[in-house]
């Protein structure tokens, strides 16, 4: 995922259409020749979708909201890591499969995975069968366990380091975890409320997300 002018630029497919946000483009209506501008933010594009769309459900109820539970924070990190090189639509469509395959994102259970579990994941067509990403999930689970011992919880570790600039967060995650490049870290922190940008202020969900008291509002 890239970022332009402070907004996330997720690429995703919906009904065969790939949107690249913050691009200035238009399409010609086949019947009446009306020029229609493409959405300028993830929020604008998603709010044009059906309420049952996986993007709409995620955007309206999860994206940019505070997460208190360590397992859910870890699960979000797994999903963001697996999105690398793929569309977010693919990950959202497989999120229930990920949850099941990784034992509800239970950190202790994932940290204890052995070779048999690794092979099980690599053979599971319901998730992303990438060895580097699977290995990163197991490795990172063990790192989170250590952070819990040292700080009380994964959440408290994040809070201890907040606030940081995006570049500072990227450096910290690179030093701490595996497979956490800049865009993965940026999206993880925006999606969990540590960095701003998940919703534009004109978005109908902006104020709703603020009610969850995201960390970026309390610097």
Question: What are the roles of these predicted feature ranges?
Answer:
Residues 7, 12, 19-21:
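Aromatic (phenylalanine/tyrosine) cluster motif
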Residues 24, 28-219:
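HhH-family (HhH-GPD) DNA N-glycosylase catalytic core used in base-excision repair
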Residues 1, 12-14, 25, 30:
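A cross-taxon signal for low-complexity, glycine/charged-rich
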């Amino acid at each position: 995922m890239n970022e332009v002018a402070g907004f996330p630029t997720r690429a995703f497919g919906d009904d065969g259409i790939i949107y690249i946000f913050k691009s200035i483009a238009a399409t010609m209506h086949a019947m009446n020749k009306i020029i229609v501008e493409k959405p300028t933010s993830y929020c604008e594009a998603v709010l044009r979708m059906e309420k049952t769309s996986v993007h709409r459900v995620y955007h309206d109820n999860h994206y940019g909201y505070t997460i208190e539970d360590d397992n859910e924070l870890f699960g979000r990190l797994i999903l963001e890591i697996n999105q690398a090189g793929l569309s977010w639509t693919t990950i959202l469509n497989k999120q229930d499969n990920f949850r099941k395959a990784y034992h509800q994102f239970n950190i202790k259970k994932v940290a204890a995975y052995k070779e048999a579990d690794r092979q099980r994941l690599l053979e599971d067509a319901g998730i992303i069968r990438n060895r580097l990403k699977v290995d990163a999930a197991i490795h990172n689970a063990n790192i989170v366990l250590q952070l819990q011992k040292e700080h009380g919880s994964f959440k408290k570790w994040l809070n201890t380091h907040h606030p940081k600039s995006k570049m500072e967060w990227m450096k910290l995650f690179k030093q701490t975890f595996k497979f956490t490049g800049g865009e993965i870290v940026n999206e993880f922190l925006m999606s969990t409320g540590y960095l701003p940008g998940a919703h534009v202020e004109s978005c109908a969900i902006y104020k709703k997300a603020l009610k969850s008291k995201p960390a970026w509002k309390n610097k």
